[in-house]
Amino acid sequence: MKSISNRDKLQDLLTQYYLNTNEKMVFLNSTGEVIALNEAAEEVFADDNDYSQMTNAVCRRCEGYSNEYDIMSCENCFLEALEIGKGSFQVFIRTKDNKIQPYTASYELIDHEKGIYAFTLHNVSPQIQRQERMYQRKMMQKTISAQENERKRISRELHDGIVQELINVDVELRLLKYQQDKDELIDNSKRIEGIMSRLIDDVRNLSVELRPSSLDDLGLDAAFRSYFKQFEKNYGIHVNYHTNFSAQRFDNEIETVVYRVVQEALFNALKYAQVDIVEVSLQLNENNIIAEVSDRGVGFKRGDDPKGTGLGLFGMNERAELVNGTVNIDSQINRGTIVTLEVPITD
């Protein structure tokens, strides 16, 4: 009698759970016909209470589930699997208001004799939204930190370089009015002209580092050719540049990421590789932009984290993630370093 009482109590609890839970519960037979569904599930699947018209209702609403093939895939459908797993998985369901929502789902055979399956859905949208907000805050903090570091670098460049040169020009100009000798006056004037010429170059270089106008006006290939020419002039390192690009243009954010990652990799080669030649390859295929910066320098161990400008060598991957790209770094001691950026492109 006690076991019957416990069974009745359990049955009552399960019934209350079925009726009152926010978890969407659907029971189907082996042909995909809906046998029953709770009120929570009716929000997604039922246009009316006529279950006989709801054969394949799950399939009609399902936009795919996350598997080894893709984030949203119908391949090897869980509804048709020969072996039903006991674990949960992520599935994407189109709701009545035509929105695609992610759910944590389970699909299990609960009655072997009658071939009854239970399909349950738990809404994970709030958790995903919280995770997205946390990720956005984290990325904002990193962006602000990178901006502040860049501002500090520019401030040092201005103070230690350009401002000091301007002070020298100011002093030289003040001294000119006291000079009587014509030849000396000419020599000093030429020296001031030289200082001013260097100042113009410094300002131009700083401007290019901040945001080259050629990148906005002409695209990646033209911007890189101009930058590499200036890089060689300023630092004495020859850049062997290979590309199959011509005049293709891409989303502004993609072009910026490719330009900055290559720029960062070049500066790291300049500072740490101890080489006088760097290879840069920029290739476009059907689905990706692939940028590669390689040197035959001193290299480093994978556990090391050499410092660089801006985001740093390993921080480049975070910038690449903004456009769904990846950065791979391959380095060996005394054999050099290869930095490869891959960015997917869409029409």
UniProtKB/Swiss-Prot annotation:
Residues that coordinate or bind [4Fe-4S] cluster: C59, C62, C74, C77
Positions bearing Phosphohistidine: H159
Chain ranges of the Histidine kinase domain: 153-347
Main localization (coarse): cytoplasm
Subcellular compartments: Cytoplasm
Tree of life domain: Bacteria
One of the record's GO molecular function terms: phosphorelay sensor kinase activity
Family matches, as InterPro entries: HATPase_C_sf, His_kinase_dom, Sensor_HK_TwoCompSys, Sig_transdc_His_kin-like_C, Sig_transdc_His_kin_sub3_dim/P, Sig_transdc_His_kinase_NreB
Regulation: Activated by cysteine desulfurase, Fe(2+) ions and cysteine and inhibited by oxygen and ADP.
Cofactor(s) of this protein: [4Fe-4S] cluster
Keywords: 4Fe-4S, ATP-binding, Cytoplasm, Iron, Iron-sulfur, Kinase, Metal-binding, Nucleotide-binding, Phosphoprotein, Transferase, Two-component regulatory system
Cofactor binding notes: Binds 1 [4Fe-4S] cluster.
UniProt KW Thylakoid keyword: no
Record-given protein name: Oxygen sensor histidine kinase NreB
Record organism: Staphylococcus carnosus (strain TM300)
Gene designation per UniProt: nreB
